[in-house]
Amino acid sequence: MKITWLGHAAFRVETAKAVILIDPFLNGNPGAKGIDFKEATRGVTHIALTHGHGDHVGDTVAIAREHGATVIANADLASWLGSQGVEKLDPGNTGGTLAHEGFTITFVNALHSSAMLTENGVSQALGNPNGLVFHFEDSPTLYHMGDTDIFSDMALINELHQPEIGIVPIGDRFTMGGAVAALACQRYFNFNSVLPCHYASFPIIDRTADKFIAGMADHPATKVLADPAGTVHSFQA
């Protein structure tokens, strides 16, 4: 399995049977400078969304139309995407597990919000925010936390799914900050590797992963992969 951070909370996950984009906010993403759009979206089969904010839905509609990718999202967000012309949708909700070729995806809790600004500037609620747990046939289990704060039921997520790789928001202000994110990883999970995200993009959130790296320093069993956007990481089952 290969995982590429595309800036902010966007990731490309490649396995033998699927190419999954998570929260594909590319155009207009300050953290995606230097990311080639065509290469980032090449061969995409699925798009998975954690919630309905514009910096996570991003280019979903355009990518889904161009590539015929299946979009996996909370039911309310999926309905809205259908109204925007997305044809291949697989809706779910918190606690639900959806099966696709080579992997399953489970919607778990996240502490955040989920809405999209309408043309008249009013926020339209788009269901609950989620974290996403991916179980693969031939690759380590992956947990993208979405946008969230720490919460004690992360312990249940670990008990039920035992994720080996974590994608963790660390930028503060709209999510937990680096120190709290490090606490979440250490207290509730046994990750082999973690990829921090939701930083180094907009100026009002943290510009570096320094606080997270410092918080993880006394937990050497977990490898922190805080590399520049565009870096490809490979993982074996």
Swiss-Prot record:
Pfam families: Lactamase_B_3
GO molecular function, one term: hydrolase activity
Domain of life of the source: Bacteria
Keyword terms, alphabetized: Hydrolase
Listed InterPro entries: Metallo-B-lactamas, RibonucZ/Hydroxyglut_hydro, UPF0173, UPF0173_UPF0282_UlaG_hydrolase
HAMAP family: UPF0173
Family: Belongs to the UPF0173 family.
Listed name of the protein: UPF0173 metal-dependent hydrolase BAB2_0644
Organism: Brucella abortus (strain 2308)
